[in-house]
From Swiss-Prot:
A Pfam match: Acylphosphatase
Domain Acylphosphatase-like: 5-93
Protein name, as recorded: Acylphosphatase
Gene Ontology terms, MF aspect: acylphosphatase activity
Gene name for this UniProt entry: acyP
InterPro entries referenced in this protein's UniProt entry, alphabetically: Acylphosphatase, Acylphosphatase-like_dom, Acylphosphatase-like_dom_sf, Acylphosphatase_CS
Active site feature: 20, 38
């Protein structure tokens, strides 16, 4: 099973609106593992790993905003060369 991993930073109305927990639900449904955390600059930082098709679906949902209260104004991603060995998808901060 081939896995890809990405590091993602989203900005906009992404804190205090349930963004992390909605993203976790999406990740759990798509069998994506990784972490998500709020950053002090108001952004949200995500590391996500999974099968390519599921990871693409996850990214599309994150870009669109995982719930109706969130609004993603900027989205940045970088591939991770080494796929971390995450256990599930965790809200870490």
């Amino acid at each position: 099973m081939v896995k890809l991993a990405k590091q993602i930073v989203v900005r906009g109305r992404v804190q205090g609106v349930g963004f992390r927990w909605a993203t976790k639900m999406i990740a759990d449904n798509l069998d994506i593992s990784g972490t998500i955390e709020n950053r002090s600059d108001g952004s949200v930082f995500i590391q996500a790993a999974g099968e390519p098709l599921n990871l693409a679906k996850f990214v599309a949902k994150v870009k669109a905003g995982p719930n109706p209260y969130a609004n993603v104004s900027t989205y940045e991603e970088q591939p991770l060369e080494d796929v971390p060995n995450f256990r599930g998808f965790q809200v870490t901060g």
